[in-house]
């Protein structure tokens, strides 16, 4: 199924000149999600399958995952060849603004409520780290 998802994304991207990474975002918030209960081995295999297919099509793959999925569902060693995008937001004004993720990350999403001139509403904000 992850390969089918990658093929779907590749088809959508055909008409665009993409120079940034293409992200795999596997989310599982609660037991109402179809993927709830997926083993770490299967979650990791799906992420890798998606990334391999995206790479075969000439794009740069990336894995987007929050704390639970990153620590409990993905084998970090197995997915380490791919770029990673990690969301972690400051929840109180007294918290320091830096990520607490133990593993290397390539992108850090530090906010979901930034204001950017020319864009209506709140948007996500990210920082890219250069390897």
Positions of PLM-derived features:
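Extracytoplasmic/secreted cell-surface and envelope-processing proteins
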Residues: 1-2, 31-40, 70-76, 94-96, ...
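Substrate-binding cleft of extracellular glycoside hydrolase catalytic domains
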Residues: 1-59
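Short, structured secondary-structure boundary patches
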Residues: 8-14, 74-89
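Structural recognition of the beta-strand scaffold that forms the well-ordered cores
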Residues: 20-26, 60-65, 83-87, 106-109
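Active-site-proximal loop/turn and secondary-structure-junction residues that shape catalytic pockets
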Residues: 28-30, 67-69, 90
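Aromatic-lined carbohydrate-recognition surfaces of secreted/lumenal glycan-active proteins
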Residues: 54-72
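Alpha-helix initiation/capping motif
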Residues: 66-67, 75-76, 124
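Functionally critical loop-and-helix segments that line ligand-binding/catalytic clefts
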Residues: 79-131
């Amino acid at each position: 199924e992850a390969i089918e998802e990658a093929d779907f994304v590749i088809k959508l991207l055909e008409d665009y000149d993409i120079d940034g990474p293409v992200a795999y975002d596997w989310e599982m918030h609660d037991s109402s999600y179809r993927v709830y209960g997926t083993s770490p081995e299967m979650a990791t295999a799906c992420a890798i399958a998606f990334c391999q297919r995206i790479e075969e099509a000439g794009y740069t793959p990336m894995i987007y995952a929050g704390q639970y999925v990153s620590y409990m569902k993905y084998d970090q060693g197995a997915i380490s060849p791919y770029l990673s995008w990690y969301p972690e937001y400051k929840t109180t004004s007294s918290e320091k603004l830096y990520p607490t993720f133990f593993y290397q990350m390539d992108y850090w999403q530090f906010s979901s409520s930034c204001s950017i001139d020319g864009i209506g509403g709140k948007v996500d904000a990210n920082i890219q780290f250069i390897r």
